[in-house]
Design a protein with these regions (language model features):
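Conserved alpha/beta-domain cores
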Residues: 1, 5-121
Length: 121
């Protein structure tokens, strides 16, 4: 399943009982969580994929998926967002989907993170 709406994140436990995996669609999740039209250039300054509500929805979904033993991935622009790579690793995400040009920068961060130590952020 691809949780795109805040409502699907809120019932992720129930959805996880019926699914083999979650692939969190971060572009739409951000749009719907922030109640914005991505096609409206005037609203672009308010489109914030780092908003605490978006990150909390992602974390809730990852935790629910893992409680039910299913794989959880991130797809959309946030998979390549190096500012969030460590955050997603600490949340327990199983996979980050991204375009080819983003693989090396993200891989560099993944290799540098020591999950046994507290976050420096």
């Amino acid at each position: 399943a691809e949780p795109l709406f805040r409502s699907s994140c809120l019932i992720a436990d129930e959805l996880a009982e019926e699914c083999d995996f979650f692939s969190i669609g971060t572009n739409d999740l951000t749009q719907y969580t922030c109640a914005l039209d991505r096609q409206n250039a005037k609203l672009e300054p308010f489109f914030n994929p780092h908003h605490p509500a978006v990150l909390r929805a992602i974390k809730m979904t990852i935790e629910a998926g893992h409680r039910h033993g299913i794989w959880v991935g991130i797809c959309g622009e946030l998979g390549a967002d190096t500012a969030l790579t460590e955050t997603f690793l600490r949340m327990g995400v199983d996979e980050l989907s991204m375009n080819a040009k983003s693989i090396l920068p993200v891989r560099k961060i993944i290799r540098s993170v020591d999950l046994s130590k507290p976050s420096e952020k």
